[in-house]
Design a protein with these regions (language model features):
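Sec-dependent signal peptide cleavage junction
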Residues: 21-32, 214-222
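Extra-cytoplasmic beta-strand recognition segments
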Residues: 39-41, 80, 90-120, 146-152, ...
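Extracellular glycan-recognition surfaces and repeat-rich motifs
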Residues: 42-79
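Extracellular carbohydrate recognition
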Residues: 142, 167-186
Length: 238
Protein backbone atom coordinates (compact mmCIF):
# COMPACT_ATOMS: atom_id res chain seq x y z
CA UNK A 1 0.00 0.00 0.00
CA UNK A 2 2.81 2.33 0.97
CA UNK A 3 4.69 1.43 -2.21
CA UNK A 4 1.67 2.29 -4.37
CA UNK A 5 1.30 5.63 -2.66
CA UNK A 6 4.97 6.42 -3.24
CA UNK A 7 4.61 5.43 -6.90
CA UNK A 8 1.72 7.86 -7.31
CA UNK A 9 3.64 10.82 -5.95
CA UNK A 10 5.55 11.70 -9.14
CA UNK A 11 2.32 11.53 -11.15
CA UNK A 12 0.47 13.73 -8.66
CA UNK A 13 3.33 16.21 -8.64
CA UNK A 14 3.35 16.32 -12.45
CA UNK A 15 -0.41 16.90 -12.58
CA UNK A 16 -0.14 19.65 -9.96
CA UNK A 17 2.59 21.41 -11.92
CA UNK A 18 0.57 21.18 -15.14
CA UNK A 19 -2.43 22.71 -13.37
CA UNK A 20 -0.21 25.48 -12.02
CA UNK A 21 1.21 26.19 -15.47
CA UNK A 22 -2.35 26.45 -16.76
CA UNK A 23 -3.18 28.98 -14.07
CA UNK A 24 -0.18 31.15 -14.93
CA UNK A 25 -0.82 30.82 -18.68
CA UNK A 26 -4.39 32.05 -18.21
CA UNK A 27 -3.22 34.97 -16.08
CA UNK A 28 -0.54 35.86 -18.63
CA UNK A 29 -3.05 35.82 -21.49
CA UNK A 30 -5.44 38.00 -19.49
CA UNK A 31 -2.70 40.52 -18.71
CA UNK A 32 -1.71 40.76 -22.39
CA UNK A 33 -5.17 41.88 -23.56
CA UNK A 34 -5.10 45.62 -24.28
CA UNK A 35 -8.54 47.06 -23.57
CA UNK A 36 -7.94 50.33 -25.42
CA UNK A 37 -9.27 50.90 -28.91
CA UNK A 38 -6.64 52.17 -31.36
CA UNK A 39 -3.95 52.36 -28.64
CA UNK A 40 -1.17 53.27 -31.08
CA UNK A 41 -3.24 55.95 -32.86
CA UNK A 42 -2.71 54.26 -36.21
CA UNK A 43 -6.33 54.56 -37.38
CA UNK A 44 -7.16 58.16 -38.27
CA UNK A 45 -10.72 59.43 -38.77
CA UNK A 46 -12.14 61.92 -41.25
CA UNK A 47 -11.61 64.71 -38.70
CA UNK A 48 -7.87 64.04 -38.72
CA UNK A 49 -7.86 62.67 -35.17
CA UNK A 50 -7.42 59.07 -33.97
CA UNK A 51 -10.49 56.84 -34.09
CA UNK A 52 -11.83 55.90 -30.65
CA UNK A 53 -10.37 58.95 -28.91
CA UNK A 54 -11.94 62.26 -27.92
CA UNK A 55 -10.33 65.54 -26.90
CA UNK A 56 -11.15 67.61 -23.83
CA UNK A 57 -9.65 70.46 -21.82
CA UNK A 58 -10.15 72.55 -18.71
CA UNK A 59 -10.14 75.70 -20.85
CA UNK A 60 -11.66 75.34 -24.30
CA UNK A 61 -10.55 78.70 -25.63
CA UNK A 62 -9.84 79.22 -29.32
CA UNK A 63 -6.15 79.20 -30.11
CA UNK A 64 -5.06 77.94 -26.67
CA UNK A 65 -4.66 74.18 -27.30
CA UNK A 66 -3.99 72.17 -30.45
CA UNK A 67 -4.51 68.40 -30.85
CA UNK A 68 -2.71 66.77 -33.78
CA UNK A 69 -1.54 63.43 -35.15
CA UNK A 70 2.21 63.22 -35.69
CA UNK A 71 4.40 60.90 -37.76
CA UNK A 72 7.04 61.03 -34.99
CA UNK A 73 6.08 57.70 -33.43
CA UNK A 74 7.43 55.29 -30.86
CA UNK A 75 6.27 52.51 -33.18
CA UNK A 76 4.06 52.33 -36.23
CA UNK A 77 3.30 55.43 -38.27
CA UNK A 78 1.55 57.78 -35.84
CA UNK A 79 1.47 59.28 -32.37
CA UNK A 80 -0.66 62.09 -30.95
CA UNK A 81 0.45 65.52 -29.82
CA UNK A 82 -1.01 68.13 -27.48
CA UNK A 83 0.30 71.69 -27.61
CA UNK A 84 -0.78 74.22 -24.97
CA UNK A 85 0.11 77.81 -25.88
CA UNK A 86 -0.90 78.85 -22.37
CA UNK A 87 -1.38 76.97 -19.10
CA UNK A 88 -4.14 74.40 -19.56
CA UNK A 89 -5.18 70.85 -18.69
CA UNK A 90 -5.75 69.19 -22.07
CA UNK A 91 -6.14 65.50 -22.94
CA UNK A 92 -6.99 62.76 -25.37
CA UNK A 93 -9.53 60.53 -23.61
CA UNK A 94 -11.26 57.18 -24.02
CA UNK A 95 -13.87 55.41 -21.88
CA UNK A 96 -13.32 51.68 -21.42
CA UNK A 97 -15.39 48.88 -19.86
CA UNK A 98 -13.78 47.35 -16.76
CA UNK A 99 -14.68 44.80 -14.09
CA UNK A 100 -15.52 45.69 -10.47
CA UNK A 101 -12.95 45.16 -7.70
CA UNK A 102 -10.15 44.49 -10.18
CA UNK A 103 -6.59 45.70 -10.72
CA UNK A 104 -5.48 47.43 -13.93
CA UNK A 105 -2.30 48.91 -15.37
CA UNK A 106 -2.37 51.98 -17.61
CA UNK A 107 0.92 52.51 -19.44
CA UNK A 108 2.46 54.13 -22.49
CA UNK A 109 5.22 56.30 -23.91
CA UNK A 110 5.46 60.07 -23.51
CA UNK A 111 7.61 62.89 -24.86
CA UNK A 112 7.42 66.51 -23.70
CA UNK A 113 9.24 69.79 -24.14
CA UNK A 114 8.94 73.51 -23.36
CA UNK A 115 6.98 72.71 -20.18
CA UNK A 116 9.61 74.21 -17.79
CA UNK A 117 8.76 71.69 -15.04
CA UNK A 118 5.51 73.51 -14.38
CA UNK A 119 2.21 71.87 -13.59
CA UNK A 120 1.93 68.12 -14.13
CA UNK A 121 3.51 68.01 -17.59
CA UNK A 122 2.88 65.08 -19.91
CA UNK A 123 1.28 62.14 -18.09
CA UNK A 124 -1.31 59.37 -18.11
CA UNK A 125 -4.19 59.62 -15.68
CA UNK A 126 -7.79 58.76 -14.84
CA UNK A 127 -10.85 60.99 -15.06
CA UNK A 128 -12.39 62.39 -11.85
CA UNK A 129 -9.65 61.14 -9.51
CA UNK A 130 -6.35 62.75 -8.54
CA UNK A 131 -4.00 60.01 -9.73
CA UNK A 132 -1.23 60.40 -12.30
CA UNK A 133 1.67 58.52 -13.78
CA UNK A 134 5.16 59.96 -13.58
CA UNK A 135 5.24 63.42 -15.19
CA UNK A 136 7.40 64.04 -18.25
CA UNK A 137 8.68 67.60 -18.72
CA UNK A 138 11.77 67.72 -20.91
CA UNK A 139 12.25 64.75 -23.20
CA UNK A 140 12.10 66.03 -26.79
CA UNK A 141 14.37 63.34 -28.23
CA UNK A 142 13.47 60.28 -26.16
CA UNK A 143 10.23 58.43 -25.48
CA UNK A 144 9.78 57.79 -21.75
CA UNK A 145 7.77 54.81 -20.50
CA UNK A 146 5.28 55.61 -17.72
CA UNK A 147 2.68 53.49 -15.95
CA UNK A 148 -0.06 53.72 -13.36
CA UNK A 149 -1.71 50.90 -11.37
CA UNK A 150 -5.24 51.18 -10.06
CA UNK A 151 -8.13 49.26 -8.54
CA UNK A 152 -11.81 49.63 -9.46
CA UNK A 153 -14.74 50.00 -7.07
CA UNK A 154 -17.11 47.18 -6.12
CA UNK A 155 -19.77 48.40 -8.57
CA UNK A 156 -17.57 50.12 -11.16
CA UNK A 157 -17.96 49.07 -14.79
CA UNK A 158 -16.07 51.73 -16.75
CA UNK A 159 -13.11 54.06 -16.51
CA UNK A 160 -12.00 57.01 -18.63
CA UNK A 161 -8.28 57.20 -19.31
CA UNK A 162 -6.40 60.38 -20.20
CA UNK A 163 -3.27 61.01 -22.24
CA UNK A 164 -2.71 64.41 -20.79
CA UNK A 165 -0.72 67.63 -20.74
CA UNK A 166 -1.42 69.20 -17.36
CA UNK A 167 -3.81 68.06 -14.64
CA UNK A 168 -6.17 69.11 -11.88
CA UNK A 169 -4.57 72.19 -10.27
CA UNK A 170 -1.50 71.39 -12.35
CA UNK A 171 -2.03 73.14 -15.67
CA UNK A 172 0.92 73.10 -18.06
CA UNK A 173 2.00 74.78 -21.26
CA UNK A 174 4.33 73.40 -23.89
CA UNK A 175 4.04 70.20 -25.92
CA UNK A 176 3.53 66.52 -25.11
CA UNK A 177 3.32 63.46 -27.37
CA UNK A 178 1.88 60.00 -26.64
CA UNK A 179 2.14 56.58 -28.27
CA UNK A 180 1.63 52.85 -27.66
CA UNK A 181 -0.80 53.20 -24.77
CA UNK A 182 -2.08 50.13 -22.95
CA UNK A 183 -4.76 49.33 -20.39
CA UNK A 184 -4.64 45.76 -19.13
CA UNK A 185 -6.19 43.85 -16.26
CA UNK A 186 -3.61 42.37 -13.87
CA UNK A 187 -3.77 39.99 -10.93
CA UNK A 188 -2.05 42.49 -8.62
CA UNK A 189 0.48 45.34 -8.76
CA UNK A 190 4.18 44.43 -8.62
CA UNK A 191 5.84 44.15 -5.23
CA UNK A 192 6.31 47.58 -3.68
CA UNK A 193 3.68 49.26 -5.88
CA UNK A 194 0.41 50.38 -4.31
CA UNK A 195 -2.61 50.58 -6.62
CA UNK A 196 -4.46 53.90 -6.51
CA UNK A 197 -8.24 54.06 -6.31
CA UNK A 198 -9.73 54.68 -9.74
CA UNK A 199 -12.97 55.89 -8.18
CA UNK A 200 -14.25 58.47 -5.73
CA UNK A 201 -14.17 57.01 -2.18
CA UNK A 202 -17.34 57.14 -0.11
CA UNK A 203 -17.87 57.72 3.60
CA UNK A 204 -17.94 53.94 4.06
CA UNK A 205 -14.51 53.51 2.48
CA UNK A 206 -13.26 51.58 5.51
CA UNK A 207 -15.60 48.73 4.60
CA UNK A 208 -14.95 48.86 0.85
CA UNK A 209 -14.02 45.51 -0.66
CA UNK A 210 -11.83 47.24 -3.24
CA UNK A 211 -9.74 48.81 -0.48
CA UNK A 212 -9.37 45.42 1.20
CA UNK A 213 -8.30 44.01 -2.16
CA UNK A 214 -5.64 46.68 -2.60
CA UNK A 215 -4.31 46.16 0.92
CA UNK A 216 -4.14 42.40 0.44
CA UNK A 217 -2.21 42.72 -2.82
CA UNK A 218 0.25 45.18 -1.31
CA UNK A 219 0.84 42.93 1.69
CA UNK A 220 1.04 39.65 -0.25
CA UNK A 221 2.61 40.24 -3.69
CA UNK A 222 3.96 36.68 -3.81
CA UNK A 223 0.65 34.84 -3.42
CA UNK A 224 0.98 32.87 -6.72
CA UNK A 225 4.24 31.30 -5.55
CA UNK A 226 2.76 30.48 -2.15
CA UNK A 227 -0.04 28.71 -4.01
CA UNK A 228 2.53 26.76 -6.05
CA UNK A 229 4.35 25.61 -2.93
CA UNK A 230 1.07 24.53 -1.34
CA UNK A 231 0.08 22.45 -4.35
CA UNK A 232 3.49 20.76 -4.45
CA UNK A 233 3.30 19.89 -0.76
CA UNK A 234 -0.14 18.36 -1.16
CA UNK A 235 1.01 16.33 -4.15
CA UNK A 236 3.97 14.95 -2.21
CA UNK A 237 1.80 14.08 0.75
CA UNK A 238 3.89 16.24 3.10
Amino acid sequence: MKRNRLARRPLLLLLSLLMLLGIFSTASAEESTNLLQNPGFEEIGADGLPVGWKTDAYLNLEGMTFYTVSDNAMSGAHSVQIENLDHNDARFCQTVAVEPSSFYRLSGYVKAWDTLDEGLGGNLSIKDVYVFSESVYDSPDEWQYVELYGVTDTDQHEVTVYARLGGYSGESFGTAMFDDLSLVKVDAPPEGIVASRWYQPTAAVQDDTSDDLADTAAASPAWPWMTAVGIAYVALGV
